[in-house]
């Protein structure tokens, strides 16, 4: 699995999000509560396959190291011929712990 570190992702975002797609693979309410700036959210993997080009540079993330959603999405994309996919395994948990900016309402469903 091709991984990207917190520092590498921060550097990519600082250069500008136009050269890659940052994709959060979590539910709508989780996305609304908080996400990494510049992220888009995919409802289903089928929707992701339609929205993301196989030649695009893609970074997938979820809530953190204990969540398997990003790893599952990574495997599906790779199996469908997407070569430039990386997984940010640290997810929101590591991003927030590093003190980097988040977007969203901050309100989580209980």
Language-model segments: what does each one mean?
Residues 1-21, 28-60, 64-110:
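Rhodanese-like catalytic fold shared by cysteine-dependent sulfurtransferases
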């Amino acid at each position: 699995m091709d991984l990207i570190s917190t520092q590498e992702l921060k550097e990519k975002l600082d250069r500008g999000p136009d050269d890659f797609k940052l994709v959060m693979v979590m539910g709508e309410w989780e996305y609304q509560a908080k996400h990494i700036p510049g992220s888009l959210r995919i409802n289903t993997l089928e929707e992701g396959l339609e929205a993301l080009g196989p030649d695009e540079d893609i970074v997938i993330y979820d809530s953190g190291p204990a969540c398997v959603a990003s790893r599952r999405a990574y495997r599906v994309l790779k199996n469908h011929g997407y070569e430039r996919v990386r997984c940010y395994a640290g997810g929101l948990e590591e991003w927030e712990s590093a003190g980097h900016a988040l977007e969203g309402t901050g309100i989580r469903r209980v």
